Regions:
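His/Asp/Glu-rich metal/cofactor-coordinating catalytic motifs and the adjacent surface-exposed loops
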Residues: 2, 6-223
Length: 223
């Protein structure tokens, strides 16, 4: 999953979300392995991934309903993993019936669900707001966020043009934002190493230990 996120870091947001639907670690972590339909009419639904997909990954809280979550859960049935290496789509465990999601009714499958979500403005605003908070300031300027979102939509959800526009803007270099961002423990320790030309090739355990003491352990969620 780390490699997947790096691959799409400045790439296409929509394609990232589509690919993440089939990421074995994500399927395991958010319980979609337990989300399946059986064609005899019985089912085991797990709403965890559908809820996080809408709330934390694409739209943000308040832009969907509980009913949307329930119907999106049906769209995501049948995707599971064989551990952490490969994803599996089982048609016999997928609910092919019509669903109504975000006021659209159709046989909405896994990829169709993402297409439907990205037909709305919320994903562009959601990610633009997150990028602003990460690179500029914790309280977003909604006018700038809307400008970023418009650029994202124009470029079919490519992230790089949005970042280029932000980094080239006068707003980004406003003196009021200087010193407003803190380095994470990993950034702090590795930047210190880089600036002081310290060789840590044989002392990585110390770096990991000090980062742990500072509250960040690599590859342990949410870090």
């Amino acid at each position: 999953q780390n490699q997947l996120l790096r691959q799409f870091a400045t790439g296409n947001f929509k394609n990232l979300v589509k690919t993440m639907n089939y990421d074995p670690a994500m399927l395991e972590w958010l319980d979609n392995n337990q989300n399946y339909f059986i064609n005899d009419g019985t089912f085991t639904f797990n709403e965890n991934y559908a809820r996080e997909l809408l709330e934390l990954f694409t739209m943000g809280e308040g832009n969907y309903s509980q009913f949307d979550i329930e119907e999106a859960t049906r769209s995501l049935t049948g995707i599971s993993s064989d551990g952490l290496m490969h994803s599996i789509f089982s048609p016999i465990r997928h609910d092919f019936g019509n669903k109504t999601i975000l006021e659209v009714t159709d046989d909405i499958g896994v990829d169709n669900l993402i297409d439907l979500i990205f037909e709305r403005q919320e994903p562009a605003l959601f990610l633009s707001r997150k990028l602003y908070q990460w690179f500029v300031y914790k309280i977003p300027d909604e006018i700038i966020v809307e400008q970023m979102a418009n650029i994202m939509v124009i470029h079919n959800y490519e992230i790089e043009p949005v970042l280029r526009a932000l980094f080239a803007s006068e707003h980004f270099y406003d003196i009021n934002f200087r010193g407003s961002k803190y380095k994470s423990p990993v950034w702090f320790t590795l930047n210190t190493k880089h600036k002081l030309y310290i060789d840590i090739s044989n002392n990585m355990d110390y770096i990991l230990w000090y980062n742990y003491l500072l509250g960040q352990s690599l590859f342990y969620p949410p870090d």
